[in-house]
Amino acid sequence: MNIQTFCLKASEGACLAFCYIRAALGKVIPEKMFGILWDAADKNIIDENDNCYVNDAIALMKLANPNKKYSVIKKDISSLEELDGQLAAVSYKNGGYNHFVLVEKGQILFDSLDDSKCVKYGKPTTARIIKIEDK
């Protein structure tokens, strides 16, 4: 895939993938995060032809940081308080749209967009609770 086409596809749907990558890295490193996303598409860990659908969250986080052990549990939620402060990729829904952000201790830790209408006007609906441990 050409780089500009990949960028367009990533801009439309890589929010969950970026949340997993950010969780594994522990901080935002844009050029590294984009490189990991590219490698993940090359390895079929994400599907760039399906809104950057994450085929394997654990493999994606291991690609970002192989020195940790990861687990992910999906949970339906209606508020951030239900997460008890845990690290999670949370989907906010607004109308027919949704957007994932990384949340910890009830606060948004990372949002791949500057101004998400889903987060601003929507409600949290699902969470991917992320556990990270040393190997």
Give residue ranges: language-model regions.
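Short intrinsically disordered terminal tails
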Residues: M1, E133-K135
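Active-site nucleophile-adjacent alpha helix/oxyanion-hole segment immediately C-terminal to the catalytic cysteine
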Residues: M1-D47
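Conserved active-site-adjacent core of cysteine acyl-enzyme catalytic domains
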Residues: W38-R128, E133
